[in-house]
């Protein structure tokens, strides 16, 4: 693909568009199951962060999801209202809010586990193909952030 600074390639030839629309397709594939769980996709992502390590600060969750804390706060409030997590002040640093799963939030992890099966079936890819793609996209993301700054990818 030849890149011209005067005429961008057609939208369907742009990698950013392919990644963007693939993300939308994945969210649409997940939507029926997320609806059953009573979750939005961003709420599901927040819970995933907590399922991998409970009791995290708002800042740590925001960093893991590449979001601003101010964007995350309304999501956390809705998840707390739904009984899936608790927000408490950090006793050693009152400026920090610590997020912890409730029993109901932990129990939801098992029910949400089938989302990866949904992607596998909808994509018509093998598990290895999806793992390789995941690796490549993460590598691209990390390379871009290493150049532009602004996000420390979680390990």
Identify the role of each PLM range:
Residues 1-37, 131, 144, 155:
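N-terminal leader segment of winged-helix/HTH proteins
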Residues 4, 8, 12-15, 19, ...:
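Alpha-helix initiation/capping motif
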Residues 22, 26-29, 65, 108-127, ...:
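Alpha-helical linker/hinge and terminal dimerization helices associated
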């Amino acid at each position: 693909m030849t890149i011209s600074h005067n005429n961008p390639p057609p939208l369907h030839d742009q990698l950013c568009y392919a990644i963007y629309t693939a993300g939308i397709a994945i969210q649409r594939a997940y939507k029926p199951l997320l609806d059953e769980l009573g979750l939005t996709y961003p709420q599901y992502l927040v819970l995933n962060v907590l399922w991998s390590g409970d009791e995290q600060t708002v800042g740590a969750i925001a960093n893991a999801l590449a979001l601003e804390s101010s964007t995350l706060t309304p999501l956390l409030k809705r998840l707390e209202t739904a009984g899936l997590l608790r927000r408490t002040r950090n006793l050693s640093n009152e400026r920090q809010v610590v997020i912890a799963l409730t029993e109901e939030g932990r129990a939801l992890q098992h029910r949400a586990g089938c989302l990866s099966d949904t992607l596998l079936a909808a994509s018509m890819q093998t598990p290895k193909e999806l793992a390789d793609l995941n690796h490549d996209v993460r590598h691209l993301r990390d390379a871009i952030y290493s150049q532009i700054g602004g996000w420390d990818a979680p390990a």
